[in-house]
Amino acid sequence: TPIFVRKDSGMRTIADLKGKRVTMGYSAMRNIDQVTRAMLATARLTEADIKPVLVPNVVRSADDFVASNADMFFFAFGGPKVREADVSVGGIRALEIDPAGMPAARKIMAWGYLTDVAPGPAFTGVEKPMKIYSFDNVLITHAKAPDDLIYKLLDSMVQTKADLVAIAPPLQEFSAAFGYRA
C-alpha cells in the first residue's frame, strides 16, 4: 500500500515528505496511523519532521490531497479513489520505500514487509519496478466462532480468487496457505 503524491511534485521517495503536509491520525482506521508512522520511519522521519493533516480515514486522505489540503495520500492499489485522484490532479506517483529503512519501520509495526510492484493497470502511479510497504489484512472473530465458518470463508476466497483478482489485482498473491496464519 503506497503513499501517493502529485506526479509533478518532484517527490520520489518517502524521504521527500520532510516538511510536507502528511495525512495522519486516521481516527476511524487506527491501524493506518501506525502504517503511516512506519512508512515515515523507513526514511528516518517522524511526525516532528512533517506537517500533520488529521483525517479520519483513507477516503478523506485522498479527498484532502485532491483539494490541495495535503501533499500526499494513502490508499491501497486498485481502489477507485486512487484512479479518481490520478485523473483529478493530472497524475500521481507512488513513493518508493528504501529497504534499508525497514528495521526502523519494524520498531513501529513489526509485521510490515516490502512487496515488489511494477507498472501496470492495477498499479496506478508506479513508473518503474519498485518496493512498496505492505501489511496483511486481518480477519478478527470472536473466540466462539466455529472453525468450519473460517474454513468456509477462506475456501470461498480461494474458489473465487479469479473474481477477487479482477476487482483487486493485488490479491493475486492470495492463497489458502497465505490466508491462514495463527
Describe the residue ranges of each PLM region:
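Generic hydrophobic/packing signal
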Residues: 4, 23, 28-31, 44, ...
